[in-house]
Swiss-Prot record:
GO MF entries: ATP binding; CMP kinase activity; dCMP kinase activity
Keyword Phosphoprotein: no
GO cellular component, one term: cytoplasm
Protein name in the entry: Cytidylate kinase
Amino acid sequence: MIITISGPPGSGTSTLARGLSEVLGVRWVNSGDLFRRIAAERGLSLKELGRLAEQGPEIDYLIDDAQRSLAKSGSGIFEGRLAGHMLDADLKIMLKTSLSVRASRIAKRENKSIEEALSEARAREECEARRYKMYYNIDINDLSIYDLIIDTGRWDERGTLSIALAAIRALK
């Protein structure tokens, strides 16, 4: 079974992906980890690779190809902003919540001010929206491709995991 989890920074995608991977006993493929691996292979910092990704689609395409290749080799939880668009999944999950909640989570996780996290999240989301539209003609704000959309501001980690597991069990 292939499950994709997408959502903006701070929405809880990694938390849900980790939880599903543990409960279901399947691997978790994180596009952020793929990005970090590419940076390490090229001897670049994450910031440097991010700037490079803004100059052309090559980096995004490498990540897409890696996810597709891993999906062909079996079941898993595939986490990433475009995972739902790139993979033929059995279940496509989108996590969302308000920017203020996400900024608060990011600030706590990365030990920075809420204002800084808010500013960085806005800038990142605007950059990603432009890139995805330009490179793929994807409107990242169009949620119509997702089977399940969960507002993680309404449920805690356990509640979000329970909702996702109920959807997965209903598929079988």
